[in-house]
């Protein structure tokens, strides 16, 4: 059991505090989060990758409550953001900018400028147009923008079609074939600093194999980039492992890490 929500004598409790008691104090409706559960989950991931230089990031879009973001910040978590508002919240919550990755489609010029001025870790780019926009914004500020391209590895995540993002027919990310030429273009742009390769193959993944397929394909890409003398520092692997809604049996983070590190 990975969480701290339990029934005692038919009454739901969170970390041994009856939900009824909380309702009596704060009124209903309310959200009740268990810090102990979130801490345990974060540590499970973070410790699983202890043997390699890594950054475990929380997806801010999944819960942008500043109290929760502050908890993760105190644990040393990074943040994966998809908007200027999420960047504002992450910084407000005490997350260092060098632990923030800006993903997502449709980043506005204002958001890009704000993220550049904040000195975030990197931008995950989703299109050639976005690459031009990032280069332009960085030129305006006279700096190098750290970037990765979100590659679509054409892997079936075997998840629900509504939340699958890594197949060729899915609209997200850049096809592997195109990614290489995009990296070559990026290298010619004066205000881009190529630092990574990213991907996000879906949500609610309950098997390790789609991640392994993805990793194999991204390794090939990284190797051919190295031949072109493009040195990639970061490999951004997404999305997260699934959770047990009913019958699912997702792998434990340690199994996930072991498989990837092998």
Residue ranges and their predicted role:
Residues 1-145, 189-193, 220, 227-230:
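A charged N-terminal "starter" segment
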Residues 24-31, 117-123, 161-174, 207-211, ...:
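Glycine-rich tight-turn/loop motif centered on a GG-T
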Residues 41, 152, 176-193, 218-232, ...:
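Structured alpha-helical segments in the cores of large, soluble enzyme domains
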Residues 59, 146-152, 198-200, 236-238:
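Short beta-strand segments
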Residues 65-68, 86-88, 109-111, 153-168, ...:
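Conserved radical SAM core fold
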Residues 118, 127-193:
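Conserved anion-binding
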Residues 203-262:
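C-terminal active-site-proximal or functional interface alpha/beta core segments in diverse enzymes
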């Amino acid at each position: 059991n990975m969480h701290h929500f339990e029934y005692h004598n038919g009454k739901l409790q969170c970390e041994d505090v009856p939900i009824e008691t909380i309702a009596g104090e704060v009124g209903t409706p309310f959200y009740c989060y268990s810090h102990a559960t979130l801490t345990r989950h974060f540590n499970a991931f973070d410790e699983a990758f202890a043997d390699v230089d890594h950054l475990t990031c929380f997806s801010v879009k999944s819960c942008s409550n500043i109290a929760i973001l502050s908890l993760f910040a105190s644990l040393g978590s990074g943040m994966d953001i998809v908007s200027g508002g999420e960047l504002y919240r992450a910084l407000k919550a005490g997350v260092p900018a060098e632990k923030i990755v800006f993903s997502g489609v449709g980043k506005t010029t204002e958001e890009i400028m704000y993220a550049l001025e904040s000195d975030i870790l990197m931008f995950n780019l989703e299109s050639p147009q976005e690459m031009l926009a990032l280069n332009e914004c960085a030129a305006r500020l006279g700096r190098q923008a750290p970037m990765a391209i979100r590659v679509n590895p054409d892997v079936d995540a075997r998840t629900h079609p509504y939340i699958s993002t890594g197949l060729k027919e899915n609209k997200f990310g850049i096809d592997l074939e195109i990614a290489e030429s995009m990296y070559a273009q990026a290298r010619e742009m004066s205000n881009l600093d190529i630092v990574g390769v990213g991907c996000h193959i879906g949500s609610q993944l309950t098997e390790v194999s789609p991640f392994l397929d993805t990793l194999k394909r991204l390794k090939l890409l990284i190797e051919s980039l190295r031949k072109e003398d493009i040195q990639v520092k970061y490999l951004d692997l997404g999305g997260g492992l699934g959770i047990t809604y009913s019958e699912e049996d997702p792998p434990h983070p340690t199994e996930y890490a072991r498989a990837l590190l092998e």
